[in-house]
Amino acid sequence: MTQARCPALLIAAPASGQGKTTVTAALARLHARQGRRVRVFKCGPDFLDPMILARASGAPVYQLDLWMVGEAEARRLLARAAGEADLILIEGVMGLFDGNPSAADLARRFGVPVLGVINGAAMAQTFGALAYGLAHFQPDLPFSGVLGNRVGSQRHSDILRDCLPPGMRWFGGLPRSAEFELPSRHLGLVQAEELADLDARLDAAADALRASAETDLPEPVTFEVPAPAPLQRSLEGVRIGVARDASFAFLYQANLDLLRELGAELAFFSPLQDQALPAVDSLYLPGGYPELHLGRLQGNRAMAEAIRAHHAAGKPLLAECGGMLYLLDCLEDADGERGELLGLLPGRARLQKRLTALALQEVELPEGRLRGHTFHHSTLDCAVEPLARGVCPNGRNTAEAVFRLGRLTASYIHFYLPSNPQAAAALLAPARDAD
């Protein structure tokens, strides 16, 4: 097994909402502007943060999760990045030690040093206690130092620095500023494509970081390069239509890469804007925000008829979360506004004010076992008997249904297709290739 070396840093925090994404994006934009090739990863299954980080770095962002992605695939992704980049940045998820697996587990497994980001607003000496806890809760954690976020002044930054334990590295204090705050909504950050001033925000964050913090490259980390695992090109010649617009944008880059590696040609289309489907053998409707675009989705009757005709012809259709909601008879948003949708999956859903499911999921389908995750604010009433139900590896009761009507497969689960390439191919292969 060969090795690849590259400077790397995992940006983590004691909790969500501390500014991990802002700091990671600022670092990525700063180094990219200096001509470095930056590759960014996101711990866990999140879709929204990677959209911001991809814009900041100028390169696709991949998820890293020791369970959903798997250690071997995570190692391959990191080694590939190390072979082509000048800097690897990994944004953590939730708090540093939260979840199973956690961001700390990933840092320890691959020897990536951790930069702790702590929201220093309205805080003084307690900052030092939080920093000490992050560094010492797990003795074998490679910990690089801390950065204060949302700092009120230079004097405030000095106070935070001076309360750190002896020997702990102080990266600096990023000031509080509306110029680079990233807005959010019910599922997380607002999508990158919806922020007209995103590049200005990222540049402002990079400028502020350069003026207030250490931004030198971290020490190189050695990554083992695994032997390549050849894939059978079982989707050779298959054309897959992939919905991608403001309604349906929750797509793992690794899923798209895999489908192409299996031989498929991807044709992207917009259920919001397009009047017809591209000429395709199969359809993939990912998650997103259909509830924010009910009027336009309901009004695009030409697209609705095209998707209904695709299903009636017995062609494969895979729908995840928001894509599944699009297939229902009716979707109602949290304010009571309703939209009549495709009617391919008998049932209705309603958006709630609170989160209704958040869990990793593994499900056994006739095509094979797939892993993924679920994260939604809606409740579903569906008359179809589930084909299967997911299982949460952490013992939670969440067991998302997978529905099957002919070649239509739909679920709240966002599938991580590289967890079983053969199953992914079977779900999307036309009948002539499935025998």
From Swiss-Prot:
It catalyses: hydrogenobyrinate + 2 L-glutamine + 2 ATP + 2 H2O = hydrogenobyrinate a,c-diamide + 2 L-glutamate + 2 ADP + 2 phosphate + 2 H(+). Disulfide bonds: none annotated. Its cofactor is Mg(2+). One of its GO terms (molecular function) is cobyrinic acid a,c-diamide synthase activity. Keywords: ATP-binding, Cobalamin biosynthesis, Glutamine amidotransferase, Ligase, Magnesium, Nucleotide-binding. The active site is at residue 321. It comes from the Bacteria. Pfam families: CbiA, GATase_3. Pathway: Cofactor biosynthesis; adenosylcobalamin biosynthesis; cob(II)yrinate a,c-diamide from precorrin-2 (aerobic route): step 9/10. One of its GO terms (biological process) is cobalamin biosynthetic process. Residues 239-422 form the GATase cobBQ-type domain. This is Hydrogenobyrinate a,c-diamide synthase. The lineage of its organism: Bacteria, Pseudomonadati, Pseudomonadota, Gammaproteobacteria, Pseudomonadales. The gene is cobB.
